Amino acid sequence: MRVAVEGLAHRFEGTDLLFENLSFVAEPGVTIAICGPSGCSKSTLLSILAGWEQPYAGTVTREGVDRVGWVFQNPYGVAERTALDHVVFPLLAKGMSRREAEPKALEAMELFDLEYAADRRFCALSGGEAQRLMLARAVCSRPNMLLVDEPTAQLDTRTSHSVSHV
């Protein structure tokens, strides 16, 4: 797996460039942090890296990337579904049986210290628990590219530190 970005630029129609001449290479196992103030188009860049948006200029080459995990800036979920239902969902969507999917989902939840919350409804989770749940959902299908947008924004310092090591 390798992601190469060359001369990337982007703007929305009728606006100035949001960023320009951005180039980097992400090799397997490398973590890249994209930092900047609110509104500087970090989320837009992630959408381009995922292939959801086309850049204004430049190229993104994704070699060997066939499974992308994504964690949005704000945790979204179905209020009445359980935490386990949320993590199992992407596995079921790929055709796995619930019997096969549940152990994998619980393993991902354990990575983020959420095994205790498996039967809790999404609406009963704290903001930090919901954010960690979205991280568990993103990693349960073993993506070879993981994009996270403000992954620790709703987490306390201790939890934020432990999440960054996963």
Where do the PLM segments sit?
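Q-loop/switch helix immediately C-terminal to the Walker
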Residues: 81-92
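Catalytic Walker B motif of ABC-type/P-loop ATPase nucleotide-binding domains
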Residues: 146-149
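The feature captures the beta-strand-to-loop junction immediately N-terminal to the Walker
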Residues: 35-37
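Conserved ABC ATPase "signature" region
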Residues: 99-117
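Helix-to-loop junction immediately C-terminal to a conserved catalytic motif
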Residues: 50
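Conserved catalytic motifs of ABC-family nucleotide-binding domains
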Residues: 142
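Conserved ABC ATPase signature
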Residues: 121-125, 129
